[in-house]
Structures are given as C-alpha cells and as structure tokens.
C-alpha cells in the first residue's frame, strides 16, 4: 500500500486504532472458540496495519512446565511468508534473555536485529532465520 501524504497515514492509523478497540470490545461477547479465533485474527491484522508490521504473532505455553512456546495465531502482510508452522514447541532455552525479561513483565523492542547479534545471540539466531529485522 503506497501512502500519498501524512493525512492519509493518520487516517489509516486512526482506522486501525478503531478496529483494534472494536475487536477488543467484541471479546466480551464471544460465544465459542471459532468466534474468538476470528476476532483474534482481525485484531492481529489491525495491530499489523497500525504498526506497519509484516507479521503479528500470538504465542502460548506448550506445556504446564512453561518450557516451550508455540505460535497459535499469526497475521502476515501481503506477500509475507507465514512462519506459524515453523514456530511450534520452541524451547525457552532458545531465548534465555527474553524469558528473564518476560518474567519481569518487560516489553521487548528491537529496532535493529543486527544490534542484538552479540548481546542476545540465541534470540538473534531465532529471528534471523525468519528474516526479521525489528520486533516489538
């Protein structure tokens, strides 16, 4: 999508924010898993559009022991290859730095993946294989 001017960008952002809030409000009225799944997919798309992301994921714990994660929902922009099938039962040992931050309820923001190559080598490798350059 080619944006012509700043006003158009603000309109897109405003519409995406409205969609995000609307999808969140619908969660209180969900009657079954299929409906929840549809709302989550719409919400991920709106978040992707709002942030300009290529992909938006949701991960859940794979086991009660919380030793691995699986990608349960994914939205991808046009012409972006889905990774959901490759992101199943990922051992938390592949992301030790992130797990510490998650436990402290910290947000992870990576503006430039290459800047994490030496400080977070495990996470770097995990993201590099998916051709991810930045992450929130």
Regions found by a protein language model. Give the residues of each.
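Signal-transmission linkers at sensory-effector interfaces
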Residues: 1-39, 49
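Short regulatory alpha-helical segment in sensory/regulatory domains of signaling proteins that mediates
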Residues: 25-35, 43-52, 60-63, 127-128
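Short, conserved clusters of charged catalytic residues that mark active-site
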Residues: 38-43, 93, 118-122
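GAF sensory/regulatory domain recognition
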Residues: 57-105
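Per-ARNT-Sim (PAS) sensory domains and their PAS-associated C-terminal
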Residues: 68, 129-131
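Terminal output helix/cap of sensory domains in signal transduction proteins
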Residues: 98-99, 124-127
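Soluble sensory domains of the PAS superfamily and closely related sensory modules
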Residues: 99-108, 115-119
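A short, aliphatic-rich beta-strand micro-motif
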Residues: 133-136
């Amino acid at each position: 999508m080619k944006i012509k001017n700043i006003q158009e960008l603000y309109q897109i952002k405003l519409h995406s924010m409205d969609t995000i809030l609307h999808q969140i409000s619908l969660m209180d009225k969900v009657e079954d898993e299929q409906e929840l799944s549809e709302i989550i997919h719409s919400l991920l798309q709106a978040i992707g559009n709002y942030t300009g992301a290529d992909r938006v994921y949701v991960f859940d714990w794979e086991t009660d022991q919380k030793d691995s994660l699986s990608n349960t929902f994914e939205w991808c922009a046009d012409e972006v290859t889905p990774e959901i099938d490759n992101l199943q039962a990922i051992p938390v040992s592949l992301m030790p730095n992130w797990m510490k931050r998650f436990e402290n309820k910290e947000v992870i923001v990576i503006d430039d993946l290459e800047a994490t190559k030496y400080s977070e080598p495990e996470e770097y490798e995990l993201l590099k294989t998916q051709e991810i350059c930045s992450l929130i």
